[in-house]
């Protein structure tokens, strides 16, 4: 091909006069963007040579003098006399606007840098440019300034290589900035290397001593994979189609984010404003996914109207087309205008992806579900925006009806209690200090937002009320400066249900109002679960553990256990109380708890085979007055039907029991009991009961089933009075770790949660003893 690339291939269209007068028309601007565009134009010429199969290495060098050198190992710009211009072709290419091989279809099937246009514009806007060509065994050289020849064209040496080297100095009379930016250039060269996997681009910046080499054999498939920083829903999908002299290459994948990252290129030129190639891809993709939803989604899911934005949520894609004569909107090629490209790309995308979906149903379903989720999220976001666009007036009319607002309008001194239940809300409203304390009752458990999509979340009345009351919006409309209360206090019953509601609310805040947590606005109230009364003594106790510890401390007074100090006994019985609590939990899950306790306290028995273990268990049951009616033994388990005071129970002893987190925790706690080496003449649980019974003599213990059982005065003095209350501030030290924790414990996946509990049960060391 080399001998066919000569002077006759360079077509001349018109002169160069206007470039210096209106540089913006040719390079976009005279700022940092236009400056780098100069380098791109020269590099694009080398890329054209590579696309035509004549070049595989491009070297770009920024010098300490402020110039840029671009070299390639292509065929070299023709140097023979031009047939119509009566001057060397190299001179024509560099001094005549619209003179280039691009305009001769036989030279380049496709071309990115408008060959000749780009180089001549660069020449016109440079205070100096030196062109060196290796061709025909010779080295040719010519110098220019401001687009004009300043040295004779001539041979300066011999060479067996071929290629072109352009060195230019941007004109500081034209450009506002003449300092090249390494990172901007490296990003562009990296893109070019992805788009042209056979090319190596070596980039060196002598000003800072940096050097990088870009070469990606995986091409644009590797590009989308490298762009993805999240969990991928699909592997990279790639296709390449040639039709009507147009080459279409597309690579895409989906991840679990909510944004789209679509990059498009025409003849290696990035088209930041898109164009007909992007439109064609989007059209084809939307059709494929819409068709797949129509054929495979449930009837209820089909009701969701899918838009193009929905199918591109979580999409990372590269669309690269090679077009013989592209029409760009604007000289800087920001947008492709060639209308015939759209149907070609649309057809190619539709046909390939339709086939791909048929052959890869798992990934197709993942993409379908992602689009359906996006559609629901879009509707929800619309609803959320409408909610937050309500009047910002603080008059009661714009706030939730159940909200009892405070009198203060100063957020820094205002606090809002999110209270579990209407009845508790009533007590809180009466007991509060209304000058700075607002009350918002929440009915029942709010939604687990980790398992629900945004549309469902925002249908929740409780969540709507919170968003409106806080005043700071949600999602994209969130504005922390509009928060109406700087303390948001979650106040729930002091039981398991209350803890669950706390967790649900914290999950919501972490996922959708994270800045409230990050800025220290979320707190947990600490209401008591028990009230202990004896004579004139009245003690509020936070939970079961606090009650048990208080009963132990009170009950050992007046009791005498010979040889045992009071503090030792107190610590010992606290461990026994923890052991009893675990045994109660085990009893809820496994039958014949007496046998399970016996094995925990005699762990050496478990080390034998099942026949030996069964023999020991049988003897133990007989001493307890229990009969074994039937049994079955193999190497994996023991099964026996035992007549106990509870009736007929099936006893199952196998690996599932021994590895259960509660069994392992009970064994760990009992080892701590044994380590204390205290001896009594009765069972340790009976000793604990004796102490508790002593503490309960003459006392009444009230358990608050809910906050609503407290009268307003009690609620104020235990939970709401700033001078005595205890609040826990919620903080997040490690956002990624917190994200993983919420996902693990509140998410849809059961297996990871189970695996975590089983894996960590043996590490339980958190007992406060």
Curated annotation (Swiss-Prot):
Chief location bin: cytoplasm
Entry keyword set: ATP-binding, Cytoplasm, DNA-binding, Isomerase, Magnesium, Metal-binding, Nucleotide-binding, Topoisomerase
GO biological processes: DNA topological change; DNA-templated DNA replication
EC number assigned by the record: 5.6.2.2
MF terms (GO), sorted A to Z: ATP binding; DNA binding; DNA topoisomerase type II (double strand cut, ATP-hydrolyzing) activity; metal ion binding
Site, as annotated: Interaction with DNA: 445, 448
Span of domain Toprim: 414-528
Co-factor: note: Binds two Mg(2+) per subunit. The magnesium ions form salt bridges with both the protein and the DNA. Can also accept other divalent metal cations, such as Mn(2+) or Ca(2+).
Broad enzyme group: isomerase
Note: Few gyrases are as efficient as E.coli at forming negative supercoils. Not all organisms have 2 type II topoisomerases; in organisms with a single type II topoisomerase this enzyme also has to decatenate newly replicated chromosomes.
Identification of the protein by name: DNA gyrase subunit B
Gene that encodes the chain: gyrB
